Amino acid sequence: MSNCAGVIKSAIADGPGVRVSVFLSGCPHQCPGCFNSEAWDYDYGTPLTPEAIEKVQSLLDHSFIQGLTLLGGEPLAPQNVEASIRLATAAKRLEKDVWIYTGYTFEDLMALAFTSEQYRKILILCDVLVDGRFQQEQADKQLVFKGSANQRIIDIPASLEQKKLVLWEEPYAHH
């Protein structure tokens, strides 16, 4: 069973609108400069029991909450994919969007999805994927919704439909 390193009930930095952010414990990447290195340990935090997932669902069940963001640690580590699927499914049941921050690349995940039902499921449930390891030398506090310039903000439904990577564009951005 996966562990939860923490929950932010009304996050505003982890995607658009007001969101519920869930940090899953355990990370194989262990990026230097990570802002959440205590969550690298898979045993950190509290177990993500069915009751804990119900609690997250109740936090999501408010009209002012736009969506769920899954972070870590690494929410898409093999040990965490099942919990991420359960959390994302709870969000979708309430018609909330799902953002996932991962150190894996979109290309890595598409390759995994080719052979893994779990990775196919989580990609189908995901609206936006912020991919790539945090790279300290490319860190920039001015970046919106990502920590380092190498990371990409990907529109997953459009990418799956068009069979190519499609970057997410903020609906209200002025170009």
What are these regions (language model features)?
Residues A13, L109-M110, E137-K146:
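Flexible glycine/acidic-rich beta-alpha junction loops that bind and position SAM and/or redox cofactors
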Residues S2-A5, V18, N36-K121:
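Conserved Radical SAM active-site core
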Residues D127-V128:
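Well-ordered beta-strand positions
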Residues H29, S63, I124:
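Structured loop/turn residues at beta-strand edges in well-structured enzyme cores
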Residues L76, Q136-E137:
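Glycine-rich nucleotide phosphate-binding loop and flanking beta-alpha elements
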Residues M1-F23, P32, N36-Y42, L165-H175:
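N-terminal [4Fe-4S]-dependent radical SAM core
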Residues R120-I124, G147:
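Short, conserved loop/helix-junction motifs that constitute active-site signature segments
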